[in-house]
């Protein structure tokens, strides 16, 4: 019985960690999910965004005390506007998705929501990390050697 409990705890700790993508693995995944060139945004810009928002970590979260919202997942999608965490006051949930879905190792839901974010007039500029680290920079290094 102790062995079953210990095994359960070990598996739980592995699950909680989530997936941390390798750079090229993420580039290939984002390309397969249709982000390369989506709304005119290069694959390199998407990978740069993910690097600076979450360091390629699907389980990344960041609480924002000002509006009591939280950013979720590989793209750090915010609960005030885009997803529902059941806690953020006045949440919009424009992606019509649970914020927990943005923390999955399978990032298809996160990509779908990111596509919704960039369909707004602000586009990819909605992400502060993209503006601070990727905008008007040579981002080709983020897909270099990835064969994409």
Curated annotation (Swiss-Prot):
Pinpoint the C-type lysozyme domain residues: 19-148
**What more is known?**
Lysozyme C is capable of both hydrolysis and transglycosylation; it also shows a slight esterase activity. It acts rapidly on both peptide-substituted and unsubstituted peptidoglycan, and slowly on chitin oligosaccharides.
Disulfide-bonded cysteine pairs: these are: 24-146, 48-134, 83-99, 95-113
Phylogenetic placement of the source organism: Eukaryota, Metazoa, Chordata, Craniata, Vertebrata
InterPro entries named in the record? Glyco_hydro_22 (IPR001916), Glyco_hydro_22_CS (IPR019799), Glyco_hydro_22_lys (IPR000974), Lysozyme-like_dom_sf (IPR023346)
Q: Identify the gene encoding this protein.
A: LYZ
Q: Family assignment?
A: Belongs to the glycosyl hydrolase 22 family.
Quaternary structure annotation from Swiss-Prot or TrEMBL: Monomer.
Question: Which EC number(s) does UniProt give?
Answer: 3.2.1.17
UniProt keywords (A-Z) are: Antimicrobial, Bacteriolytic enzyme, Disulfide bond, Glycosidase, Hydrolase, Milk protein, Secreted, Signal
Signal sequence, renumbered to the chain: 1-18
SUPFAM superfamilies per UniProt? Lysozyme-like (SSF53955)
CDD domains given in the database record: LYZ_C
Biological role stated in the UniProt entry? Lysozymes have primarily a bacteriolytic function; those in tissues and body fluids are associated with the monocyte-macrophage system and enhance the activity of immunoagents.
What positions does UniProt annotate as the active site of this protein?
53, 71
**What does the record give as the reaction this protein catalyses?**
Hydrolysis of (1->4)-beta-linkages between N-acetylmuramic acid and N-acetyl-D-glucosamine residues in a peptidoglycan and between N-acetyl-D-glucosamine residues in chitodextrins
| Highest taxon listed in the record's lineage | Eukaryota
Compartmental location: Secreted
A Pfam family annotated for this chain is: Lys
Alphabetized GO MF terms:
identical protein binding; lysozyme activity
What's the protein called, per UniProt? Lysozyme C
- Report one GO cellular component: extracellular space
Q: Mainly localized where?
A: secreted
Mind listing the GO biological process terms from this record? defense response to Gram-negative bacterium; defense response to Gram-positive bacterium; killing of cells of another organism
